[in-house]
UniProtKB/Swiss-Prot annotation:
Belongs to the 2H phosphoesterase superfamily. CPD1 family. It holds the Pfam family CPDase. This is 2',3'-cyclic-nucleotide 3'-phosphodiesterase. One of its GO terms (biological process) is cyclic nucleotide metabolic process. InterPro entries: Cyclic-nucl_3Pdiesterase (IPR012386), Cyclic_Pdiesterase (IPR009097). Transmembrane segments: none annotated.
């Protein structure tokens, strides 16, 4: 993961406090797990070697989100409509899962958002892919095939999670988000295209959750080397 770009809800907001409460709650259920800040990882493996690089990345984040939002507004404005991509929150949720991977032990899965995906593609092209001849195509392929935005609620090596713990996880998420969790069946013939092989349990929400955040929010460049407790925020910018 090395150097990653996060998008975080504003501190003190309903989204921040609700997600942080769930993270603390699951840490008590799995005591050896670390506590961390709620965030969506926009991209990781950033080429970032200095404070100047950090500042360039953050400046590019602001420029990218402003440009993409303006483009979406103008595109729909010509038709006399308000763009759904502009009106919809950058981060909202449609389900959750308990996975096999350490960093995806319990996650809230995000709805697709054109602006968030656009920012991820731009940042990937500018600061991850280094070959000038292939960076655009590789970033486009990555965002369409590998970018699955989510908010992690638990980091843990425990697998499988017991049925008793699964019931607690389900109940706490239902209570916090005011939704009912409906088990999602794996689509036949999907292979692992939907990530089914990487999860122990996956649920959809029965209704749309109001938990979300848009702008304002905070981009952070984070050094994710070593144990979670040693991760360091190298820079941040509010949008």
């Amino acid at each position: 993961m090395a150097i990653a770009l996060w998008y975080c809800p504003p501190q003190g907001s309903v989204a921040y406090e609700t997600l942080q409460m769930l993270i603390f709650s699951f840490q008590t259920l799995f005591p050896d797990s670390p506590v961390f800040e709620p965030h969506v990882t926009v991209t990781s493996h950033l080429v970032c070697n200095s404070k100047d690089d950090v500042n360039k990345i953050l400046t590019s984040c602001v420029a990218a989100i402003q440009s993409i939002r303006s483009h979406q507004t103008a595109k729909k404005g010509r038709k006399g409509q308000v763009s759904h991509a502009v009106a919809a929150p950058l981060v909202s949720f449609n389900g959750c899962s308990v996975g096999k991977q350490y960093f995806k032990k319990i996650v809230l899965e995000c709805n697709k958002n054109k602006i968030l995906y656009g920012v991820a593609q731009v940042m990937r092209e500018m600061y991850v892919e280094i070959d000038p001849e292939t960076r655009s195509s590789r970033a486009a392929t990555w965002v369409h095939e590998e970018f699955h935005p989510h908010v992690s609620l638990l980091y843990s090596d425990i697998h499988p999670v017991s049925q008793a713990s699964l019931r607690v996880v389900q109940q706490r998420i239902e209570d916090a988000l005011d939704v009912q969790l409906v088990p999602r069946e794996k689509r036949k013939g999907s292979g692992n295209a939907d990530g089914s092989n990487e999860v122990q349990m996956r649920w959809d929400f029965d209704v749309s959750s109001s938990l979300s955040w848009n702008i304002p929010g905070t981009f952070k460049v984070v050094n994710c080397v070593g144990p979670v407790q040693e991760w360091e925020v190298l820079g941040r910018v509010d949008v």
